[in-house]
Amino acid sequence: MNNKEHIKSVILALLVLMSVVLTYMVWNFSPDIANVDNTDSKKSETKPLTTPMTAKMDTTITPFQIIHSKNDHPEGTIATVSNVNKLTKPLKNKEVKSVEHVRRDHNLMIPDLSSDFTLFDFTYDLPLSTYLGQVLNMNAKVPNHFNFNRLVIDHDADDNIVLYAISKDRHDYVKLTTTTKNDHFLDAFAIVKKDMQPYTDIITNKDTIDRTTHVFAPSKPEKLKTYRMVFNTISVEKMNAILFDDSTIVRSSKSGVTTYNNNTGVANYNDKNEKYHYKNLSEDEASSSKMEETIPGTFDFINGHGGFLNEDFRLFSTNNQSGELTYQRFLNGYPTFNKEGANQIQVTWGEKGVFDYRRSLLRTDVVLNSEDNKSLPKLESVRSSLANNSDINFEKVTNIAIGYEMQDNPDHNHIEVQINSELVPRWYVEYDGEWYVYNDGRLE
């Protein structure tokens, strides 16, 4: 019995000693948090792609060309940032004295329009309320959800400027009588007019018969230089840090495509074409097609993390069904085109934030002038070839414009150190809602 009692006493003493040791360890435990991500500190340390909020709405939501017509003799110029600013400045912060909405069942006619007017030509349609409020800072009660893609500026009507916003289908327009004095606008126009060259107006279908609905393009384009654009690559880690709310990211890679995801979103990165595609899982129910919300929303979202890269990105297309907006890189006032989408930012808005975000991770490092001038065919040659091509329905041609083709990895003078593209001036045609390069009578 004595041995048993002795053993019990030893065991009890050991248990008491272990309890004391464990209690001391618990009270003095200090966790190692060196390798634990703190979401709040991570967000505060997240760096933007470039300096945020440097892009301006009035240089991002712009026309692609400016047309002047006097007595049915058109002339025009590309919509450089400088030209657009000069012509919109007299219109900004003015009042709208009257608004009138007119609907035409057949071809559009504007009987009150004078024979001397200027036209802003857009490649996309957008809400009139957005353009007036966000770009011109005009307060006007206009028809709900009225979209337009041409703005006619009548500077020969009485003493004040009259605006006509024309719908994309060419059957509606909204007339706005402003407090802008004609003389103020004409002073600015006189400077822009120096850059204008002869343009030709083309009728492609029954909706482009009126003088404000023609397809306009330069009659005989001037020789344009070719360029080489050298790029830097934006790191995927920087994009992930901006878009993902927490640090838990699972990576998987297959066939050159790497997938990153957590409980808030999923992103795919293709290292062959440097394309990045992010989808917000908290906004996956439905996208928003309300352009009054999506245009300012997507602009602020991209601008907020420096996503426009301090380059000339402009809104280029809007999809009223899916809600997707495409911002496109411009060079010297001309749009650039690339089959891989290396020149685009595509974004769709949800109920509260970004729903879908696709972009190239290429940032322009330097643009080199090749000193080579390229001649383009005359517009009449382009028009005639398209009209006589049996594979093309000429009635579906809605725009003809000059742009720069970004040709990846050209055979000559290839710079091996950095990704680069050669930019070559070409004719482009908007056909059935899509843009194609014109090549010897064909659309490619």
Model-assigned labels for residue ranges:
Residues 1-7:
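Short, Lys/Arg-rich N-terminal segment immediately upstream of the first membrane anchor
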Residues 83, 95, 283-322, 369-415:
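Short, non-transmembrane alpha-helical segments in secretory-pathway proteins
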Residues 24-290:
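Preferential activation on post-signal-peptide N-terminal prodomains/segments
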Residues 423, 441-444:
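Extended, non-globular interaction scaffolds
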Residues 8-26:
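Hydrophobic membrane-insertion alpha-helices, especially the h-region
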Residues 352-377:
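Short helix-loop boundary/capping segments
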Residues 70-75, 349-351, 395:
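Non-catalytic terminal regions of proteins
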Residues 237-276, 308-354, 358-360, 402-435:
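Exposed beta-strand-loop-beta-strand "reactive/processing" segments of non-cytosolic proteins
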